Design a protein with these regions (language model features):
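Conserved N-terminal structural module of periplasmic/extracytoplasmic solute-binding proteins
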Residues: 2-116, 126, 131, 181, ...
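Short helix-initiation/N-cap motifs at beta->coil->alpha
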Residues: 76-85, 185-190, 266-280
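Extracytoplasmic/periplasmic substrate-recognition and gating elements
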Residues: 61, 65-66, 91-92, 177, ...
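Hinge/lid segment of periplasmic solute-binding proteins
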Residues: 105-165, 216, 307
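Short, solvent-exposed loop/beta-turn-alpha elements that line the ligand-binding surface or hinge
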Residues: 121-136, 224-249, 299-301, 313-321, ...
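Extracytoplasmic/periplasmic solute-binding protein
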Residues: 146-160, 165, 189-239, 284
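C-terminal capping/gating helix-and-loop segments adjacent to ligand/active sites or protein-protein/ligand interfaces
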Residues: 235-236, 323-324, 361-371, 382-440
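Glycine-centered hinge/linker elements that transmit conformational signals in sensory
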Residues: 192-195, 235-268, 307
Length: 441
């Protein structure tokens, strides 16, 4: 077979360089967008930076080699780009065979109702995709057959990774200032203040992209809410309201963090990637970010120099519903030329081989991590222990933007206003509820 030119792309899609790979794999090739012939399999996701991008592209290259004359093309997008682009291109029959489709009403529900996703029930049984994860995690990729009920019914996508959002910390700064990992939310705020008094930035945070505030607010709210409330609001039972006291109290607490100076100065104009880069360069004591950042932090700050802990509860020993769950699932679009082959690719992306590669990179695969793979007092050890604990204690919450179609844009905008003290906590909650209630009409 002829050699293909592999074009590496930046997140915006502009060319960044080129390298020659194996005979049947293309990565981020701009000309490759759209429906392909029967010998080409295209998949899109949000894996656009190493080590995650390298892992998925190695798996795709192996899959191409295992399937004769097949060409596999991969494109990694930002989440915002993928969510905006995918439904439109599938509707025009120019979409990929396989794509990550964000959970809930953010994207999956609307695409099912629009007839843009393939029913994968037969493949779930064939490949055993429902095995090994608790029902509460599987529910995040489930919808009824008509796409109207979230969290029940059948699987519409499969996740290769798990996700949990917590606090990365710089061990050297903690030791220098004389603080320890906190066990309550009040303790965390006391640590923030000690770090601030010592001239350190307590929490490196950038909200230019908007989505980071969902995580920050969500984890504060997770200390104040219940499973019944959070499942009800996200799975849209119609019995819960955003004008709940827990939402108002969490919003007030977040505003207090801003006024106390706990967040990185100028966070409004700093992107999530830039904030992470600052922390990874040794600037700032903590970074609230998802498990997907662990590989980069381990590589840059150091696997022994960084640690990880989950947002502590209001009272010691209490429960917190942490932002997270399973990673964005891979689904088969109705543009797929060969759904059977598309399903086989997904199976490769969620295989034991993929699981091992993610663990090797210090990332978090979907499923419990075996004790013999956990090294204490390391970044990955902290992360894996925290994840296993959250799974066993049913302590995984949700991403609030899953709650309604278009809710992502609304909640990111309202959180920016909340952080800027442009709305009160009560107004913030009322604005969320007005949009949420309208989504049922």
């Amino acid at each position: 077979m002829a050699m293909h030119r592999r074009t590496l792309m930046k997140r915006t899609g502009a060319a960044a360089g080129a390298a020659v790979l194996g005979p049947a794999f293309l990565a981020n090739t701009p000309a490759a967008l759209g429906a392909q012939d029967e010998n080409t399999l295209e998949f899109w996701d949000t894996l656009n930076a190493d080590p995650r991008q390298s892992i998925v592209e190695t798996l795709a290259e192996d899959f191409a080699a295992e399937n004769g004359d097949l060409t596999v093309e991969h494109r990694g997008w930002t989440l915002e780009e993928l969510q905006d682009t995918l439904p439109r291109v599938v509707d025009s029959n120019q979409g990929p065979d396989v794509a990550q489709v964000n959970n809930g009403e953010s994207l999956m529900g609307p695409m099912i109702r629009a007839g843009q996703l393939v029913d994968i029930s037969s493949y779930v049984e064939e490949y055993g995709w429902a095995e090994g994860l608790p029902e509460g995690l599987l529910a995040r990729n489930m919808y009824s057959a008509d796409g109207t009920e979230f969290g029940t019914g059948q699987l519409w996508g499969v996740s290769s990774e798990a996700e949990i959002v917590g606090l990365y910390y710089n061990r050297a700064i903690f030791e220098e200032v004389g603080v320890e990992v906190p066990t309550t939310l009040d303790d965390l705020e006391a640590v923030f203040q000690q770090l601030l008094d010592a001239g350190q930035t307590p929490l490196v945070f950038g909200n230019l992209d908007g989505w980071t505030a969902i995580h920050l607010f969500g984890n504060i709210h997770g200390t104040m809410t219940t499973r019944e409330y959070l499942d009800g609001i996200v799975y849209r039972t119609g019995e819960q309201s955003f004008e709940d006291q827990s939402i108002i109290d969490a919003a007030a607490r977040l505003q207090q963090w801003v006024s106390n100076g706990y967040l990185l100065e100028g966070f409004e104009g700093i992107g999530a990637d830039d904030a992470a880069a600052l922390f990874e360069a040794g600037s700032g004591a903590m970074l609230m970010q998802g498990s997907w950042q662990a590989g980069s932090i381990g590589e840059n700050l150091g696997a022994d120099a960084a640690g990880f802990f989950l947002t502590p509860p209001l009272e010691e020993g209490g429960n917190v519903l942490h932002v997270g769950g399973v990673g964005i699932p891979y689904a088969i679009t109705t543009n797929a030329t060969d759904p059977d082959l598309a399903a086989a690719l997904i199976n490769k992306l969620v295989s034991e081989e993929a699981f091992a590669a993610l663990v090797e990179a210090g990332l978090l695969p979907a499923g419990e991590i075996a004790d013999d793979q956990i090294t204490p007092d390391t970044l990955s050890g902290d992360l894996y222990s925290a994840w296993n604990s959250a799974v066993r204690n049913d302590s995984l919450g949700h991403y609030l933007d899953w709650a309604a179609p278009g809710f992502y844009d609304l909640i990111t905008s309202e959180l920016q206003r909340l952080l800027g003290n442009q709305v009160t906590p009560e107004e913030f909650a009322a604005n969320l509820q007005e949009f949420y209630a309208a989504s049922f009409e």
